A protein has these predicted regions:
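N-terminal amphipathic/basic leader segments beginning at the initiator methionine
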Residues: 1-43
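Histidine-anchored nucleotide/phosphate-binding helix
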Residues: 73-92
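Short glycine-rich or small-residue beta-strand-to-loop segments that form or flank ligand, phosphate
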Residues: 62-73, 98-104, 162
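Short alpha-helical segments and helix-capping/turn motifs at coil-helix boundaries
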Residues: 48-51, 82-86, 143-153
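Short helix/loop capping segments that flank catalytic or ligand/cofactor-binding pockets
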Residues: 14, 23-25, 74-75, 162-163, ...
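Hydrophobic or amphipathic alpha-helical targeting/insertion segments
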Residues: 86, 90-100, 105
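Glycine-rich phosphate/diphosphate-binding loops that line cofactor/substrate pockets in enzymes
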Residues: 48-64, 89-94
């Protein structure tokens, strides 16, 4: 029997002899009530136990948006247009907004990768940078002795917005 499996951004074709195949487990298809864009807008209009972002931020504040790097499937490029609109409604200016890709111990992105992650509009309007372990501000030490060092663009922001997704991770 021939099968196609998603692998990276492509497809891996494999053949398994019928005698070696016990069965195939497939996920059930779940119908979405809203499109991705509609869901992002709903989340911004109906925040859980919070004011709307436009009601929290103030004109002139520096805003850091922290998001995942290329190793995670967070659809940052799909979220950013609505998020930027929300921030602008609250009085934020593009020159005061920085999108920070939290790379942790991973390699830095290329400009092309950062642009793809941010999306064309965000890339054109705001500053998009990788976190930098060599440019951190030391905020202190935990009770367990662990140093707390935060990348400068995030530490110096007046407001920090963290984007992320929930996924199985091992």
């Amino acid at each position: 029997m021939n099968y196609e499996l998603g692998y990276g951004k492509g497809i891996q074709k494999i053949e398994i002899p019928d005698a070696n195949l016990m069965g195939v487990l497939l996920p059930e298809n779940a119908a979405a009530e809203r499109s991705e864009d509609q869901e992002v807008l709903r989340a911004l209009e109906e925040p859980i136990e919070s004011l709307k972002l436009r009601e929290i931020i103030r004109p002139g504040e520096k805003i850091a948006i922290v998001t995942s790097d290329i190793t995670r499937p967070m659809p940052t490029s799909k979220v950013m247009p609505a998020l930027l609109d929300e921030l602008y409604r609250g009085g934020a200016r593009p020159e005061n907004i920085t999108l920070v890709f939290a790379i942790g111990s991973h390699r830095h992105h290329t400009d092309e990768e950062r642009k793809a992650l941010a999306g064309e509009r965000a890339w054109q309007e705001i500053r998009c940078v990788d976190s930098d372990p060599d440019d951190c501000i030391h905020l202190g030490t935990t009770s367990g002795g662990t140093p707390v060092d935060i990348t400068r663009a995030v530490a110096e922001a007046d407001r920090r917005i963290c984007l992320g997704n929930i996924e199985y991770h091992y």
